[in-house]
Design a protein with these regions (language model features):
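Rossmann-like dinucleotide/phosphate-binding beta-alpha-beta segment
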Residues: 123-159
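A structural signal for well-ordered alpha-helical scaffolds and beta->alpha junctions
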Residues: 7-11, 87, 147
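Long, low-complexity, intrinsically disordered polar/charged segments
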Residues: 1-4, 38-55, 111, 116, ...
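Phosphate-binding beta-alpha-beta segment of Rossmann-like dinucleotide-binding domains, i.e.
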Residues: 79-137
Length: 159
C-alpha cells in the first residue's frame, strides 16, 4: 500500500484514479508521495519518506526540482491536463467578443426597469449582431497542447 499526502485541494475524481493499492493520509511523515497543485515547496520540510511529488499542473516552478533530484525524489507534472479547458475558454472569448455578448448583457441590465424595453431592444439590437466566425482567419501562435486544440476548434467553426 502506497500512502499519498495531498497538499492542495485535489478533486475526488482525481483521487479515484489511483485505485487500489493507494490510500490518502493526513500526516506528511506517513506519506510515500505528495500530490499537489500550487503550493510553493521551496523551503518546505520534506520528510525522508517522500519518494515522489506529483503536481496537478503544467509547470514545476513551485517545486525545488534540483534539490529534490539530489535526494532521489522524482517530480512529475501534468502538462496539457487543462488544455481542453483553456481551448474552451479561448473559443468562448472568440464568440463573446465577435458577437458583442458582454455589451448586450450590459445593455439589458441598464434597461431592465425600462417599461419600454421591448421597443428599445428592437431599436438597439443591430448594435449587438456582431460577426460570424465562419470564414474568418485566425492566427494561432504555437501548436502545442493548447494551440493545436484551438486551431482544430477554429477549423470546426469554419474559420
Amino acid at each position: 500500500m502506497r500512502h499519498i499526502k495531498t497538499i492542495d485541494d485535489i478533486t475526488k475524481d482525481g483521487k479515484v484514479e489511483f485505485g487500489d493499492g493507494y490510500d490518502f493520509v493526513e500526516n506528511t511523515e506517513e506519506a510515500d508521495a505528495i500530490l499537489m497543485r500550487s503550493t510553493d515547496l521551496h523551503g518546505y520540510e520534506l520528510p525522508t519518506s517522500i519518494r515522489a511529488i506529483a503536481r496537478c499542473g503544467a509547470g514545476v516552478n513551485n517545486i525545488p526540482t534540483d534539490e529534490y533530484a539530489k535526494r532521489g525524489v522524482v517530480v512529475f507534472n501534468s502538462p496539457g491536463a487543462n488544455s481542453n479547458a483553456v481551448k474552451e475558454l479561448v473559443i468562448a472569448m472568440l464568440i463573446l467578443s465577435s458577437r458583442g455578448v458582454v455589451q448586450s448583457m450590459k445593455w439589458v441590465r441598464a434597461h431592465a426597469d425600462d417599461p419600454n424595453i421591448l421597443v428599445d431592444a428592437e431599436k438597439a439590437k443591430k448594435a449587438f449582431v456582431g460577426r460570424e466566425l465562419k470564414g474568418k482567419r485566425i492566427g494561432v501562435v504555437g501548436l502545442g497542447n493548447v494551440g493545436s486544440k484551438v486551431a482544430n476548434a477554429c477549423v470546426d467553426l469554419g474559420m
